[in-house]
């Protein structure tokens, strides 16, 4: 019985790890007209990055590391802001 319970816990943990890693959303860092990324703060979701991503035709973005990162943004296209 103890082995079955331990096995069940291990299976559940591996499923959780798989679901966390499987949630990667594709995206990219948008560039301005000078081929630079947009730096913003604070880390995480912020209005400036969302505004930049919307200018690039994407609904949502956030600060990931230092530059803004846009979800589902594949091709890098320069936009004059």
Swiss-Prot record:
Start and end residues of each LCN-type CS-alpha/beta domain: 25-81
Annotated S-S bridges: 49-68, 53-70
Tissue specificity of this protein: Expressed by the venom gland.
SUPFAM superfamilies: Scorpion toxin-like
Subcellular location: Secreted
Top-rank taxon: Eukaryota
This protein's GO CC annotations: extracellular region
Signal peptide boundaries: 1-22
Main location: secreted
Keywords: Disulfide bond, Ion channel impairing toxin, Neurotoxin, Secreted, Signal, Toxin
One Pfam family, short name: Toxin_3
Gene Ontology molecular-function annotations: ion channel inhibitor activity; sodium channel inhibitor activity; toxin activity
Similarity comment: family membership: Belongs to the long (3 C-C) scorpion toxin superfamily.
Biological function: Probable neurotoxin that inhibits ion channels.
Domain notes from UniProt: Has the structural arrangement of an alpha-helix connected to antiparallel beta-sheets by disulfide bonds (CS-alpha/beta).
Protein's name in the database: Toxin-like peptide AaF1CA5
């Amino acid at each position: 019985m103890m082995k079955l319970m331990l096995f069940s816990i291990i299976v559940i943990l591996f499923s959780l790890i798989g679901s966390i890693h499987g949630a990667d959303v594709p995206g990219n860092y948008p560039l301005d007209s000078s081929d630079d990324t947009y730096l913003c703060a604070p880390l995480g979701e912020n209005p400036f990055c969302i505004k930049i991503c919307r200018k690039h035709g994407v609904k949502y973005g956030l600060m990931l590391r230092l530059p803004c990162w846009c979800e589902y943004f594949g091709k890098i296209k320069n936009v004059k802001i």
